[in-house]
Amino acid sequence: MKQSMVFSPTLREVPADAEIKSHQLLLRAGFMRQNASGIYSFLPFGLKVLHKVERIVREEMERAGAVELLMPAMQAAELWQESGRWYSYGSELMRMKDRNAREFALGATHEEVITDLVRDEVKSYKKLPLTLYQIQTKFRDEQRPRFGLLRGREFLMKDAYSFHATQESLDEVYDRLYKAYSNIFARCGLNFRAVIADSGAMGGKDTHEFMVLSDVGEDTIAYSDTSDYAANIEMAPVVATYTKSDEAEKALEKVATPDQKAIEEVSAFLNIEAEKCIKSMVFKVDEKLVVVLVRGDHEVNDVKVKNVYGASVVELASHEEVKELLHCEVGSLGPIGVTGDIEIIADHAVASIVNGCSGANEEGFHYVNVNPERDFKVSQYTDLRFIQEGDQSPDGNGTILFARGIEVGHVFKLGTRYSEAMNATFLDENGKTQPLIMGCYGIGVSRTVAAIAEQFNDENGLVWPKAVAPFHVHVIPVNMKSDAQREMGENIYNSLQEQGYEVLLDDRAERAGVKFADADLFGLPVRVTVGKKADEGIVEVKVRATGESEEVKVEELQTYIANILK
């Protein structure tokens, strides 16, 4: 492709609203442009990268036995109401009405549509297992779109769905697609980890996320320093044991703590360690209000609270709800005096506290010498806190460290969550009606492009891995007015294309500095500069990833490039 014919508008300055490297560079290099908050156009070079990621995805999905189809982006509300997610999915689901007031959603995901499709067509175990996938635009009404393609309102996604007669069949396909995902991200050149995850609004049980390691990732990965254990911090269980002190219990005492609300403030004011404080929080679990207790130096994990109750929605109670329930402000909450009709659950660590501290449910006061079970009752002790760095790894090997990650893929064992809700059944080999067993497998295709850009860049621009680069080689005649340079550039361009390489020829009448700056921004793997030594049959070859350059004779160029790109 000749650069003079390409729409690739570059920017010299960093856009003010672009917070992270991938967002900045994809805009500056002219790979995309923003249309509205969280909505982007892919320009020609960006689209080439997107298509290469799609191709890798398709190859690995088909190798794993999946078959491609295409479902509608616009989905009838009735299907979502049938599954129960019309009400539980939340405000991220983009909803609309047609001229006849019939409700629809723009697809955030396609479980309902695929289940409806398959239940009408697959009636016997003889047609199972079946794995279908699509690459389709998805829509989510993000409250705060940010980070470019990493959190948008419109994005490209590969979503696959498998249907089975037995759990063993689901396990087999799940493992196969887990490996396919590992192959996809490895072929894209990414440094990633597969981690144990929460299924969230998707439902189901076993699930893994594929996380690209990056400091700008919005997720925290908890991993062992000596084993291959890795989990999203939301899902990492705490296996610590807590020893209760043999300190004698003291008499409960209420003390004034004016203007002291946060644990750090209260512990400093009372000269008591944070681990002897009891942090009390009120959560709304579906429609039920529950008091949750953790140690003062720990944080409540709301996903674990959700899993205790098998709830659809868990959120912090509002200040108004707390005041109505316990007649105090949030900073003075405590378990003492909470009436028996309000359930209290606590993290295991709370049970070991002796002569601790808690809010007194009265503004400006706390209790000291608080002892669980003597001073208040807990209905259940369980694991409710986030794991911390330095905790024992849940697999018993090593200790936990943290890393940040960008989620690019997610695989779920949905089980019968959707098939039972939507009456999607088949006849088994005994002629009995059974619900279809399902799996679900998603990849953020456009997000993967951003993740690659986030991992592969330097101070000068993008540094694309060979497998996804828009072109393999960038040929730059420095001076287009020079017949020797122009003709040699054209000859190299044509010969490399004949060898099967994708080549970009900078045939613009621009200054050398402009050409080199754009070349660094684009980040193609190999740059061939045709300069003053063209008359001698010599060019300069530069490897973008390493910065290494060498003068090469034109007759040796193809072999030299082949060794770089092998």
From Swiss-Prot:
Q: Does the keyword Cytoplasm apply?
A: yes
Kindly list the GO molecular function terms attached to this UniProt entry. aminoacyl-tRNA deacylase activity; ATP binding; catalytic activity, acting on a protein; proline-tRNA ligase activity; transferase activity
Q: Which domain of life is it from?
A: Bacteria
Q: Where are the coiled-coil regions?
A: none
Question: What's the catalysed reaction?
Answer: tRNA(Pro) + L-proline + ATP = L-prolyl-tRNA(Pro) + AMP + diphosphate
Q: Which GO terms describe its biological process?
A: prolyl-tRNA aminoacylation
Give the matching SUPFAM superfamilies: Class II aaRS ABD-related, Class II aaRS and biotin synthetases, YbaK/ProRS associated domain
Matching Pfam families: HGTP_anticodon, tRNA-synt_2b, tRNA_edit
Enzyme Commission number(s) of this protein:
6.1.1.15
Q: What class of enzyme is it?
A: ligase
Keyword Transmembrane helix part of the UniProt annotation = no
* Cellular component per GO, a single term: cytosol
| Keyword terms | Aminoacyl-tRNA synthetase, ATP-binding, Cytoplasm, Ligase, Nucleotide-binding, Protein biosynthesis
**Which cell locations does it reside in?**
Cytoplasm
Q: Name the InterPro entries for this protein.
A: aa-tRNA-synt_IIb, aa-tRNA-synth_II, aa-tRNA-synth_II/BPL/LPL, Anticodon-bd, Anticodon-bd_dom_sf, Pro-tRNA-ligase_IIa, Pro-tRNA-synth_IIa_bac-type, Pro-tRNA-Synthase_IIa_type1
Q: What is recorded about the protein's domains?
A: Consists of three domains: the N-terminal catalytic domain, the editing domain and the C-terminal anticodon-binding domain.
Q: How does it assemble?
A: Homodimer.
Q: Which HAMAP family match?
A: Pro_tRNA_synth_type1
Biological role stated in the UniProt entry: Catalyzes the attachment of proline to tRNA(Pro) in a two-step reaction: proline is first activated by ATP to form Pro-AMP and then transferred to the acceptor end of tRNA(Pro). As ProRS can inadvertently accommodate and process non-cognate amino acids such as alanine and cysteine, to avoid such errors it has two additional distinct editing activities against alanine. One activity is designated as 'pretransfer' editing and involves the tRNA(Pro)-independent hydrolysis of activated Ala-AMP.
> What name does this protein carry?
Proline--tRNA ligase
Source species taxonomy: Bacteria, Bacillati, Bacillota, Bacilli, Bacillales
